[in-house]
Amino acid sequence: MLKGANQVMVNKMTADFIAEAKKATLESKFAGFGYEAIVDGIAELNLEDESKVFVVIPNAWKADLRKDDDYKSARMGEVIYNGQVGTICGIPVIATKALTDTAFVMTAEAVKLLMEEDVEVEQDRDIETKINTVVLSTYYICALVDATKICKLTANA
């Protein structure tokens, strides 16, 4: 029961994070998703230090990325053996089911999830009816705090 409640809470936080990320003002459009689309998104950020940049892509785009000739040649066949999404230009690529038609090149400074307090768990048991009640509460805010640190990647219409 608690495992399911935790998953619901994590899914809500993920949805809130994605909703804030979609407010990004920087945008890079592409004809076909792959190495060039990500590199253009990185360039759009115009950062001197790219060490904290990462890319978040929809799960469905992993295959396109793995088939990209630039990606395959950069990994020198390694992708065939380890099966990971990997890195592009030394930047980690993360895939998620929470995205469907948009990817993001960003740093952790772009979107913040600020917790007011840790998750609070309360439980109660009615001894006569043998009913247990468990309530989880959390208070947080998720916000796009630095729009210069996130670039939305979308396909040309």
How would you name each of these model-derived features?
Residues 1-28, 46-49, 55, 93, ...:
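Long, contiguous amphipathic alpha-helices that act as assembly "spine/axial" helices in icosahedral shell
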